[in-house]
């Protein structure tokens, strides 16, 4: 349910270029009218706040200082539970084609692990990646490419 709220918000406000300065109370009321549960709405809004905080933190500079570009990401057991082999392979693919950097990959993994959901699949990961790339300045080209990957697949054109 939390993933549904995030996708709804992303498509309604961010992707559609709608007015972004919406009061939290108004937003909560709209989400309640759309049929979402209060506890899920709260969790989704906290998740978005944490995404915004990641962008403003020194995490990315600390990550890039510690990781060589040729290093391989070793996933924890908990991360491997959430991110199956297909998801991890997709993250690696996006790094190899320069859609994700080391920093944005770590932000994506952080936000994936921040989700409170028992089910998580590749399509969910693609949406999380899109949200992270949209939120981090300087990633416009990567965002556009990821958006094409997501929407082309949804329309059934990608072979």
From Swiss-Prot:
Pfam families: DUF494
The family this protein is said to belong to: Belongs to the Smg family.
NCBIfam families registered for this protein in UniProt: PRK03430.1
Protein name (Swiss-Prot/TrEMBL): Protein Smg homolog
């Amino acid at each position: 349910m939390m993933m549904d709220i995030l996708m709804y918000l992303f498509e309604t406000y961010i992707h559609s270029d709608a007015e972004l300065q919406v009061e939290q109370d108004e937003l909560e009321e709209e989400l309640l009218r759309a049929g979402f549960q209060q506890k899920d709405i709260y969790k989704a809004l906290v998740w978005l706040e944490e995404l915004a905080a990641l962008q403003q933190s020194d995490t990315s500079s600390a990550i890039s200082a510690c990781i060589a570009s040729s290093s391989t990401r070793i996933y924890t057991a908990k991360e491997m539970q959430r991110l199956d082999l297909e998801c991890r392979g997709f993250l690696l693919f996006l790094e190899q084609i320069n859609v994700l950097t080391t920093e944005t990959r770590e932000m994506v993994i952080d936000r994936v692990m921040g989700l409170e959901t028992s089910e998580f699949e590749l399509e969910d990961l693609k949406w999380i990646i899109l949200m992270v790339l949209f939120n981090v300045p300087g990633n416009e080209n990567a965002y556009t490419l990821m958006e094409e990957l997501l929407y082309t697949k949804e329309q059934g054109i990608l072979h």
